[in-house]
Amino acid sequence: MAALPPGKTLQDKHYVGFSQGDALIAVMDLILDYPSPGTAMIGFFMVDISCQGRGTGTQIIAQALEALAAQGMTKARLAIDEGNPQSRAFWLKNGFVLTGERISNDIAAYLPMERPLRHGANEPN
């Protein structure tokens, strides 16, 4: 959660919690204007297991992307673990596409995904 891309500080990182009643059901971390101006980089998004498989994550992502578009962001970007087909399916369902890039480190390989943002047009597919 403390990992930062080059040129960014903790002040650039945003942590967002999503609740249902009094219960925290999802969390997201993101950095705005990275890797380029107008891009919102989603570092992670996790939904409580009790809320998975019911469309909750998709609803949250639609609302979050709409809020980002309203703030002037024009693109959302993230990177999935190459070995996580569930993550890939979730983000594809939510309008993200693979960029064709592959990023590797000592731990895993990651596949960047992106989707354009337009205020008023960020409902799930």
Model-derived features with residue positions:
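Conserved acetyl-CoA-binding loop of GNAT-fold acetyltransferases
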Residues: 92-101
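A generic structural signal for beta-strand entry/edge sites
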Residues: 37-39, 75, 108-110
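Acetyl-CoA-dependent GNAT
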Residues: 1-50, 61-63, 67, 71, ...
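Conserved beta-strand-loop-alpha-helix junction that forms the acyl-donor binding cleft
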Residues: 78-88, 104-109
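Glycine-rich acyl-CoA binding loop
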Residues: 53-58
